[in-house]
Amino acid sequence: MRLAFMGTPDFAVPALHALHEAGHEIAVVYSQPPRPAGRGQAVRPQPVHLAAEALGIPVRVPTRLRANHDEHAFFRALDLDAAVVAAYGLILPGAMLTPRAGARLNVHASLLPRWRGAAPIQAAILAGDDESGVTIMQMDEGLDTGAMLLTGRVALTPATTASTLHDDLAAMGGRLIVAALANSETAAIPQPAEGATYAARLTREDGRIDWTRDAVDIDRQVRALTPWPGTFTTLDGTVLKIGAATPIDGPRDAVPGTVLDDRLTVACGQGTLRLTRIQRPGRGMMEADAFLRGQPVPVGTRLGS
């Protein structure tokens, strides 16, 4: 098939590679424009942009698609069989949704209609879901509301992190989009209205730890929001990022946020949480024992106050 591929972050790269390896003609790749990244804030192309260039595929990086009539005309002139979207980050206007049946496909990292929106991987972990997955859906002008073609499922465990789930679902998305294009007879199933939920775009403030919450919920927050936007608390006014933690049994009458022992076990609203990976300003993420050698934290210290 002659395709356009639209994607931006690392999540979309396996789908691009899978389509290329399956022998599809990828006429053009759309990605969001290069942006500052890393400590030096150097302007860098997005991961999909780099992957497409490595494959020798032309790349377009418009800053907007709505009311971009020149881009609409270019897109129509491509004479595509299908357009595949995976975490592109811009909503396609109607003028860029090719009318061919089954040819407007999106790779979405959730079991729709649960977790439509921008952050489905993190939302599934935050909510304590038992499973997540990938849905291949036909695109319409709604937000992840189109009819579903294929789904793949993966179980979530108390050890699942956003990073591990991201990689599992990215690989699954590549396999499923190739399968969807190979079987044009797959029936599209409209999404049910019941069970629809939305995963809002994350902000840095979503990572602030509220120690009055249950230890299990805070553990989910750490696993869901590492590396972005990261979970954090404060120690004497200094921001500490928390990279990993473990809920454990502990006293129920301690003030939330109180350090209970010399292993950085912290009282929560329900239960206790042992911090196992920590980062202070200007340093890399480190194990708790290494952190404590350079920054002793006395028993009774209050975090987040």
UniProtKB/Swiss-Prot annotation:
Gene3D superfamilies, per database record: Formyl transferase, C-terminal domain, Formyl transferase, N-terminal domain
Binding site for (6S)-5,6,7,8-tetrahydrofolate: 110-113
Keywords, alphabetical: Protein biosynthesis, Transferase
Protein EC: 2.1.2.9
Class of the enzyme per the UniProt entry, highest EC level: transferase
Cited CDD domains: FMT_core_Met-tRNA-FMT_N, Met_tRNA_FMT_C
InterPro entries per record: Fmt (IPR005794), Formyl_trans_C (IPR005793), Formyl_trans_C_sf (IPR037022), Formyl_transf_N (IPR002376), Formyl_transf_N_sf (IPR036477), Formyl_transferase-like_C_sf (IPR011034), GART_AS (IPR001555), Met-tRNA-FMT_C (IPR044135)
Signal peptide: none
A Gene Ontology molecular function term of the record: methionyl-tRNA formyltransferase activity
GO CC, alphabetical: cytosol
Keyword Transferase: yes
Reactions listed under catalytic activity: L-methionyl-tRNA(fMet) + (6R)-10-formyltetrahydrofolate = N-formyl-L-methionyl-tRNA(fMet) + (6S)-5,6,7,8-tetrahydrofolate + H(+)
Keyword Transferase carried by entry: yes
Stored Pfam families: Formyl_trans_C, Formyl_trans_N
Family assignment from sequence similarity: Belongs to the Fmt family.
Family matches, as HAMAP family: Formyl_trans
Function comment: Attaches a formyl group to the free amino group of methionyl-tRNA(fMet). The formyl group appears to play a dual role in the initiator identity of N-formylmethionyl-tRNA by promoting its recognition by IF2 and preventing the misappropriation of this tRNA by the elongation apparatus.
Name of this chain's protein: Methionyl-tRNA formyltransferase
Species of provenance: Gluconacetobacter diazotrophicus (strain ATCC 49037 / DSM 5601 / CCUG 37298 / CIP 103539 / LMG 7603 / PAl5)
Lineage, opening ranks: Bacteria, Pseudomonadati, Pseudomonadota, Alphaproteobacteria, Acetobacterales
Gene: fmt
